[in-house]
């Protein structure tokens, strides 16, 4: 009901123009329905939105035309032919969110042209925590950076970027910087490697130009070298650590320092939990590991899940630098329960899978039979069963054997009478999900398998194979008594019944 009260001002707000390009405009009021119908044909999204919510019953000649006009306006507004369901939902939620904001907040947020709900949320939260004197100035770090961390784009049309000014470090800031530097030294990280900032890599190429004023933060290097215990080989993982020089650290505001503090704390916690070792330039080994949620392959963007997690933790903290020593980071993490340390054998496959077994995605394990390659040896062992015919998994009830453990588990359900998959049309139950999907094609009429010879279609692939034998003349089923061949197993079974009947007649005294 609140959407019905959406006024014309909110429908014509700038965020609509940010999402879709406006094409054409018309006068809103018309007394004749035919003229009105002609006018709405070429409406742009903003005008269509405005007309949709302001449309009245008397503007049409009856209920049928009223519904028709509303459908046209809604279609021109939402553009379902070019936008996904998620985009349409995003647009509706954004419009409603802006329409229910207090008037002062609504005007200020609309002035900055949020492109999506996440950017609007950042703007509103920024407005709530900032004093009145600073509401009109929005810095790149306060909004653009947070928008990226929440999964949105860093730059929106209408944003006025204001670079943060360098501020002299006080006693607390010096202590905070020293803590940051100590952690870098503890982990053996180099603070002078140059690379592109993570948040810049998450921005569209066309929007990168708007971040030219942010070049003062360009020493983000995400790399660590891990030496795995025993005889395991060296693995290099990029996109793990964040680096700043002392001069760059002075330019960061408390919000940013809190962000980097949280990132390093998470890295250090998970580094210790795996019990691996890091090799630094001095040759000393320090216990270290890598958070699997933070690892990204080289050249990829920061994942949306990771960005949101970091942003939520950062925005929820008021006082940056609550933890002032590496030792505290290692000993206690009050905000979340520490995970049970995992062994290297448990975590290595995950790390190798995330990183593609090295920088090039190498697949060193090759099948000698067919030449197919695999990333880990266990996959090669499983694949080799196809060539050898090995079926190591045996059913204890019927002695049937299976190549994969998953197949044995599915088969076991048939003995137990478990049929968890139920058809919503007829109520029939099935033990396997694939059987349910095949059955539902009877109700939907779907026939995805087509014969290339005659064009006839079938519900199941097995039916297509049987049909194709009528074209090829193949007869794979042979009678063991008379050596007659058949194209279908059912035909062979009927034929074998004739043999049994003849034998019964010969044995019978009558």
UniProtKB/Swiss-Prot annotation:
Residues 49-131 form the SCAN box domain. It comes from the Eukaryota. The keyword DNA-binding applies. Residues 1-35, 313-342 are annotated as: Disordered. Residues 22-35 have a biased composition (Polar residues). InterPro entries: KRAB, KRAB_dom_sf, SCAN_dom, SCAN_sf, Znf_C2H2_sf, Znf_C2H2_type. Keywords: DNA-binding, Metal-binding, Nucleus, Repeat, Transcription, Transcription regulation, Zinc, Zinc-finger. Residues 235-318 form the KRAB domain. Its main location: nucleus. Belongs to the krueppel C2H2-type zinc-finger protein family. This is Zinc finger protein 75D. It comes from Homo sapiens (Human).
